[in-house]
């Protein structure tokens, strides 16, 4: 990769430190695409078929969202690095006969914004504070992922800087 692209990646993954709080920082990542496979058969093994296919292509998957099954079908959305989006779509389209499913959509105008800290799942109100900060800026959340050390949301890339500032302010004040 070029020096310019390395600088770019450092910039988009910059972190804002939040001192003296449970939250250690706010991170932004714009190297994200959201893929959705519509109307996947709601039967055992479909997640394995989809994600093993991507693993064979060395495509890293981060956040996964699966809708509740209806009429024997469900939608599966997940994030991949922007540079892998097209090869992921191609791999999935080539395997439609194996995985079933309908249309495959890709959204390349997303960003992942995360708050990072320790023991977040055992402290009530952390996610709520983050979501309120986004709501107050009229920022729509497309996907959410939580763990013990991180809460991440997928939002429109155009809102990423505003989101980082709003979340930072919510936890500082």
Feature-to-residue mapping (PLM):
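Short, small-residue-biased leader/transition segments that mark boundaries at the very start
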Residues: 1-8
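A conserved regulatory-domain signal marking ACT and ACT-like small-molecule sensing domains
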Residues: 9-173
């Amino acid at each position: 990769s070029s020096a310019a692209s390395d600088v770019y990646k450092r910039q988009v993954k910059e972190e804002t430190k939040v001192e003296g709080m449970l939250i250690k920082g706010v991170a932004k990542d714009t190297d994200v695409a959201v893929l959705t496979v519509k109307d996947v058969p709601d039967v055992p093994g479909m997640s394995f078929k989809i994600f093993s296919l991507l693993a064979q292509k060395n495509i890293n998957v981060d956040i996964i969202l699966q809708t509740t099954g209806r009429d024997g079908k469900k939608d599966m959305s997940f994030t991949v690095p922007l540079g892998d989006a097209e090869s992921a779509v191609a791999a999935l389209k080539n395997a439609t006969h194996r995985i079933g499913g309908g249309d495959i959509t890709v959204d390349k105008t997303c960003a992942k914004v995360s708050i990072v800290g320790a023991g977040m799942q055992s402290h009530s109100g952390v996610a709520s504070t983050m979501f309120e900060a986004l709501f107050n800026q009229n920022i729509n959340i497309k996907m959410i992922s939580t763990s013990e050390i991180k809460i991440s949301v997928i939002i429109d890339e155009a809102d990423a800087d505003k989101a980082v500032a709003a979340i930072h302010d919510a936890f500082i004040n």
